[in-house]
From Swiss-Prot:
The lineage of its organism: Eukaryota, Viridiplantae, Streptophyta, Embryophyta, Tracheophyta. It comes from Oryza sativa subsp. japonica (Rice). SMART domains: SANT. Keywords: Activator, DNA-binding, Nucleus, Transcription, Transcription regulation. This is Transcription factor MYBS2. The gene is MYBS2. Residues 32-43 have a biased composition (Acidic residues).
Length: 265
């Protein structure tokens, strides 16, 4: 009996095997060979068991300690962030930097503005300034109009708009010169006679930034007055012609009256 008890005590219990994160881990039982483990003394007089299948713990080099003792400065982070911001700002400036307009392109722009008028930037870009897009033409026009509406500023740097605008003022008629021209008479030939009609010059080539509301209103009033005058003259001629025709019908011709008198006799 004693021998059986000693054999049972010596018989190792089966090890407990479980899987942890895909790795089989043995524990619990005494069936693990003692040869696989060896004791190693570490600092402080402590002993740990390590497996022979694992790499030597003492062969692992300690992590290098930085010169500043592991202390990071906040200024380093701020310098890094400022450097990144400067690079981004430089890239944005390079992207936004465009090619300046030449004098020839600006002259073509003024010619297109004179013929097509303000607002047709797509037509100016397509037919006149072909080297620029419609968006670029609209931006250039905005700068041009701002420059023209504020011409009296002192100590202002010379610009392309000023140089070309002086050359192109002779081609663009001013609203004062167009509005003060005397009206011309157009004669309409009719069956009842010649009818004179007053005609005012058509306001073409006006620049949108220099035309005043009062001048446009006065111009429209003159056109309306001339139209009313022409209609009244035409209606007067029609009434006169109708009255003349009625008189001709009511009055008998003289030879008809003589023939009637002869018959009576």
């Amino acid at each position: 009996m004693e021998q059986h008890e000693e054999a049972a005590e010596r018989k190792p219990s089966p090890p407990v095997i479980f899987r942890l994160f895909g790795v089989e881990v043995r524990g619990g039982g005494g069936g693990v060979d003692e040869e696989e483990y060896e004791e190693e003394e570490v600092e402080g007089g402590l002993f740990i068991k390590k497996s022979s299948s694992m790499p030597n713990l003492t062969s692992i080099d300690p992590l290098p300690v930085p010169a500043d003792g592991g202390k990071r400065r906040a200024s380093d982070d701020s310098e890094l962030a400022s450097g990144q911001q400067k690079r981004r700002r430089r890239k944005v400036q390079e992207r936004k930097k465009g090619v300046p307009w030449t004098e020839e392109e600006h002259k073509k722009f003024l010619e297109g503005l004179r013929q097509l008028g303000k607002g047709d930037w797509r037509g100016i870009s397509k037919n006149f300034v072909t080297s620029r897009t419609a968006t670029q033409v609209a931006s250039h026009a905005q700068k041009y109009f701002l420059r023209q509406t504020n011409p009296g500023k002192k100590k202002r740097r010379a610009s392309l708009f000023d140089v070309v605008a002086e050359c192109s003022d002779d081609q663009l008629p001013s609203p004062q010169s167009v509005g003060t021209k005397p009206p011309t008479q157009d004669i309409i030939h009719t069956d009842r006679g010649d009818v004179p009609i007053l005609s005012y010059p058509v306001a073409r080539g006006f620049r949108g930034d220099s035309v005043q509301v009062d001048e446009l209103t006065e111009y429209v009033k003159r056109l309306k007055a001339a139209e009313d005058m022409s209609l009244s003259m035409i209606s007067g001629l029609e009434m006169a012609s109708s009255s003349i025709s009625s008189l001709e019908l009511s009055i008998a011709p003289p030879h008809c009256a003589i023939e009637a008198a002869i018959k009576v006799l």
